[in-house]
Amino acid sequence: MSTVEERVKKIVCEQLGVKESEVQNTSSFVEDLGADSLDTVELVMALEEEFETEIPDEEAEKLGTVQDAIDYIVAHT
């Protein structure tokens, strides 16, 4: 089974249409990976589906980087 980090990065690549080499743990979804507000909503939905969890809107707004998403998933699954 892939690690949480690998799974999150795979989803980021798929949702944002970026290469795996562009996705670092410190990458900002908006500033570094070019996500807009719709992209971030779709990204959160994909993470919720993959990890079978719900990410409340107020928490989703705090997920600014790849590492933020990884940390949230690890803490809540």
Swiss-Prot record:
GO molecular function: acyl binding; acyl carrier activity
Carrier domain sequence ranges: 2-77
Family: Belongs to the acyl carrier protein (ACP) family.
Protein name as it appears in the record: Acyl carrier protein
Pfam families: PP-binding
A biological process term (GO) from this entry: lipid A biosynthetic process
UniProt keyword Lipid metabolism, yes or no: yes
Function: Carrier of the growing fatty acid chain in fatty acid biosynthesis.
Compartment annotation: Cytoplasm
UniProtKB keywords: Cytoplasm, Fatty acid biosynthesis, Fatty acid metabolism, Lipid biosynthesis, Lipid metabolism, Phosphopantetheine, Phosphoprotein
PTM statement from Swiss-Prot or TrEMBL: 4'-phosphopantetheine is transferred from CoA to a specific serine of apo-ACP by AcpS. This modification is essential for activity because fatty acids are bound in thioester linkage to the sulfhydryl of the prosthetic group.
Modification O-(pantetheine 4'-phosphoryl)serine occurs at: 37
InterPro entries membership: ACP (IPR003231), ACP-like_sf (IPR036736), PP-bd_ACP (IPR009081), Ppantetheine_attach_site (IPR006162)
Main location (coarse class): cytoplasm
GO cellular component, one term: membrane
Metabolic or biological pathway, per its Swiss-Prot or TrEMBL entry: Lipid metabolism; fatty acid biosynthesis
